Amino acid sequence: MIKAMNISYEIGDKLYLNITNKCPCNCTFCIRHNGDGAYGSDPLWLEHQPTAEEGIDNIKKRDLDSYKEIIFCGYGEPTCELEILKETAKYIKSVTKTPIRINTNGLSDLINKRETPAEFKGLVDIISISLNASDAKAYDEITRPSFKGVNCFEEMLSFAKRVKEFVPEVMLTVVDIIGEEEIKKSQAVADSVGIHLRVCLLYTSPS
């Protein structure tokens, strides 16, 4: 495992922010199992947990107006450091109109032990939430969350439904390797909560 302090990294015309390595899940398909970086990036394992100040200093070196999107997504779940995320997003909003997206597992309420959807208001343009499966059993098998005695699938869907009130665009995602039948069932779940489903091609493009 190679560690560095690559808090931001580019893929195509998008800037990704790697603000933490913490994550309460151990997804079977997670790219962290396959190497030190994502889609050709430099190592994303961090030498230490960066502060908001470190993250902001890092992105000040970037031309934020030049990107199509700025995405909180790295080798960890960004809502594990929610205060750092919010402070960083607030700075970004103060200097550019480039849209901000968060790629999340949707377990922010469990992670932070409080209701968090309203905290994203005015700071985030898009939230992409990993649905991963069409029911709780399959979800636990794929996502392998560390929270015990909790229906994480329902917690994730509840977060998705509530955060729609505060963020302009919300989407749910699955990866293509779950198969056509499971994707159809996942589409039905997304339709039931009125949220767009995106199918991501694993290992060919970041979600």
Regions found by a protein language model. Give the residues of each.
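A generic local structural motif
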Residues: 2-4, 56-59, 113-117, 158
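Canonical Radical SAM [4Fe-4S] cluster-binding loop centered on the CxxxCxxC motif
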Residues: 4-51
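Flexible, charged surface loops at secondary-structure boundaries
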Residues: 9-11, 62-65, 121-122
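Generic structural signal for conserved hydrophobic packing positions in ordered secondary structure
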Residues: 17, 70-72, 139
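Conserved alpha-helical substructure of the radical SAM core
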Residues: 33-71, 83
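Conserved AdoMet/S-adenosylmethionine-binding subsite of the radical SAM
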Residues: 75-202
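Conserved small/polar residues in nucleotide/adenosyl-binding loops
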Residues: 203-207
